[in-house]
A protein has these predicted regions:
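Extracytoplasmic small-molecule ligand-binding "clamshell" domains
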Residues: 30-101
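Short, hydrophobic beta-strand segments that form beta-sheet elements in well-ordered domains
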Residues: 126, 141-146
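Short helix-initiation/N-cap motifs at beta->coil->alpha
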Residues: 62, 78-89, 130, 164-180
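Short, polar loop motifs at secondary-structure junctions
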Residues: 130-131, 147-153
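Acidic, polar ligand-binding/catalytic clefts
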Residues: 75-137
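Ligand-binding cleft/hinge of the Venus flytrap
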Residues: 49-53, 65-73, 150-169, 173-174
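Loop/turn elements at helix/coil->beta-strand transitions in domains of secreted/extracellular proteins
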Residues: 73-76, 94-95, 140-141, 161-162, ...
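Immediate post-signal peptide segment of exported/extracytoplasmic ligand-binding proteins
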Residues: 2, 6-9, 13-57, 70, ...
Length: 181
């Protein structure tokens, strides 16, 4: 069993936002009515993105981007991919990304963002019997986080911790449950 510790997640980044990235705006705009827009997501952030019973990406973000496509008269396909590859795939593999993603200066140099439509906070999940209550309690510990996420960036900034990254968030949780982080 695990519990969430909000105190252990204190950081200089107070806000995160889910945002649609669209660096390939010119190419996407060139697609005529009836065309297909391909968006990437990382379906590991319910209720915003998850894999539905049919094996396809589902959730609020998927419904939102499909509604945008309908308004534009275009079909929208949503591909489930690794979170860390979303930004780099825009413009070649996908037309845009829709995912719970923090807007950072580094990302803004690579892609354009919509206005954020949801603000989230970062949490640290610890075992139920843990005595970790503050960021200081994380010294000399190993923190697991998903590659390319705000959680990864924050864990790298905490003095005295070892940051362990994972392609999928569930793998970090599994290692926590099994005592590896």
């Amino acid at each position: 069993a695990t519990k969430e510790s909000t105190q252990a997640a204190e950081s200089s980044v107070a806000e995160t936002a889910a945002a649609t990235t669209e660096a390939a705006a010119t190419e996407a705009a060139d697609k005529t009515e009836g065309g297909v827009l391909v968006f990437g997501t990382n379906a590991e952030f319910p209720p915003f993105e998850y894999v539905g019973d049919d094996g396809e990406p589902d959730g609020f973000d998927v419904a939102l981007i499909k509604a945008v496509g309908e308004k534009l008269g275009m079909e929208v396909q949503v591909e489930n991919m690794e979170f860390d590859s979303l930004v780099s795939s825009i413009g070649n593999r996908i037309d845009g990304a829709i995912a719970g993603m923090t807007v950072t200066d580094e990302r803004k140099e690579q892609v354009d963002f919509s206005d954020p439509y949801y603000e989230a906070v970062q949490f640290v999940i610890v075992p139920a019997d843990s005595n970790i209550a503050t960021a200081d309690d994380l010294k000399n510990k190993t923190i697991g986080s998903q590659l390319g996420t705000t959680g990864m960036f924050l864990s790298e900034d905490i003095e005295g911790v070892t940051a362990q990254t994972y392609n999928r968030a569930i793998d970090a949780v599994n290692d926590l449950v099994n005592g590896r982080v």
